[in-house]
Amino acid sequence: MTQLAIGKPTPLGAHYDGQGVNFTLFSAHAERVELCVFDANGQEHRYDLPGHSGDIWHGYLPDARPGLRYGYRVHGPWQPAEGHRFNPAKLLIDPCARQIDGEFKDNPLLHAGHNEPDYRDNAAIVPKCVVVVDHYDWEDDAPPRTPWGSTIIYEAHVKGLTYLHPEIPVEIRGTYKALGHPVMINYLKQLGITALELLPVAQFASEPRLQRMGLSNYWGYNPVAMFALHPAYACSPETALDEFRDAIKALHKAGIEVILDIVLNHSAELDLDGPLFSLRGIDNRSYYWIREDGDYHNWTGCGNTLNLSHPAVVDYASACLRYWVETCHVDGFRFDLAAVMGRTPEFRQDAPLFTAIQNCPVLSQVKLIAEPWDIAPGGYQVGNFPPLFAEWNDHFRDAARRFWLHYDLPLGVFAGRFAASSDVFKRNGRLPSAAINLVTAHDGFTLRDCVCFNHKHNEANGEENRDGTNNNYSNNHGKEGLGGTLDLVERRRDSIHALLTTLLLSQGTPMLLAGDEHGHSQHGNNNAYCQDNQLTWLDWSQASSGLTAFTAALIHLRKRIPALMENRWWEEGDGNVRWLNRYAQPLSTDEWQNGPKQLQILLSDRFLIAINATLEVTEIVLPAGEWHAIPPFAGEDNPVITAVWQGPAHGLCVFQR
């Protein structure tokens, strides 16, 4: 049998050099590492990795070729109280594997044991890693590098976006290929989108609990192999990576960036009763935050938390991010529960992973977006990320909903959120674009559901409606659920228009949830993470073309307003913004704090947003000048000059002079 040569300790993973494959694996506490390769008949052949450089185990297999299927068995102490859970009876996934063959199905053999090890061998049912070689031709691909100030983000799910699209060929709907189809690209261009933000596409698994209920993890926030592309979104799993890159190349040619939602905060191994896939069996003590009793710190709500302050884990995470940029040409990342990235264990702006990203010539040049919290004490870190990061601005989300749907927000607070939440983000040289403004996102109500439901309806998730937030700041306008009288439908439509206008004409970087622009509903489910069905798939046949046109007109209007595009903080007297009351006069202190919900926002001295968020029709006296209502609030060539606007209840309008 062929013997392994010592090989090299870098790079991590399995790499083919034309003559054979070099294998490397980090483990600081292992006593022995076996490489397990599987032939075409599934027969396993084991080799001890002979090289041991510091904490890196390595070996070189001559004559090995791309397509080779492999895994690891790692020997070491079983000492749960110390955080060590080595069990060589369990085949392990290479954390740096580029491709995975097989499905992660619930099986008792995937468990390593709790207090005592489970010595039943599981190689027969564990998916295998696959050695790959890359010869992809990027041709003349170049990243669009859209300035932050010009960026419009569209958050979407690979499958849900196109699975029901009638104009995309049936055989590619719901796949990476569909993202790059001309129909999809033309739609995004016409809408005005500059960046497509995709929910996780790295290899993930469905939790055993969901599988037992006949459900699956639809969103993908349960990663197994962070370097491997999720094959279920490919027309052919063997060509998944090329299909994904073809889509990125097509999007880039259209000037659209691609941002990946990436999960570095936890793994699919869940808590100690969860499955053993990889990290727990390779070096549990190094990869995870471990409590004094040997259990996990659960700062993510998912059972475990990756220790992104450990040097080896920082190297692993950094290499993963570089891989997606260098191999797939992605333009940036949205980091799930990103406060974990800064834990040491307390949150620090100079945490090791932040420093590594800052110092990396590759990662420091792409768009970085944080979901700036986790569930641990001190986990709410909105506004506290390093200057390279933009952040999801939940202050904006809650303020917009409260202002238009709950009617309980002072004008001063609303204006602060409209002005990129400068009280939160104007620090450390950050620009207004650091505020990622959103009204909705994948988690929570859709925009339509915000105006149709007062309460969540998550019974289909199998948790008796306990899951999902109760703080929705929604308003059903008098009837719970979809449908209703013409008056009800119109009032809901007006609220949607108001929320979209607030989102798309505010300072900061707007993020639109896919489907909100044509009225998608999840029927009140505000936590549809396990609903891979028509609840989450966008139904293009039922799309509201009127709402889509309204949204596109707002985005194109935004691009005409210098105050929103220049990405500079607004200062008193700089001509970017003036805040006026219903009589076109500056607001008094009392009006800011206690005044009626009527406001005029004059942008760049030419564009006026007139707001009447009261229950009554109100006359709004416009500032001096010849004002015309403009799209989407009037036709392209509206000749009507307006001096006084009869503002409908809960209404707004945009004028130009």
From Swiss-Prot:
The keyword Transmembrane does not apply. Residues 460-479 are annotated as: Disordered. Keywords: Carbohydrate metabolism, Glycogen metabolism, Glycosidase, Hydrolase. InterPro entries: GlgX_C (IPR040784), GlgX_Isoamylase_N_E_set (IPR044505), Glyco_hydro_13_cat_dom (IPR006047), Glyco_hydro_13_N (IPR004193), Glyco_hydro_b (IPR013780), Glycogen_debranch_bac (IPR022844), Glycogen_debranch_GlgX (IPR011837), Glycoside_hydrolase_SF (IPR017853). It holds the Pfam family GlgX_C. Removes maltotriose and maltotetraose chains that are attached by 1,6-alpha-linkage to the limit dextrin main chain, generating a debranched limit dextrin. This is Glycogen debranching enzyme. It comes from Escherichia coli O81 (strain ED1a). The lineage of its organism: Bacteria, Pseudomonadati, Pseudomonadota, Gammaproteobacteria, Enterobacterales.
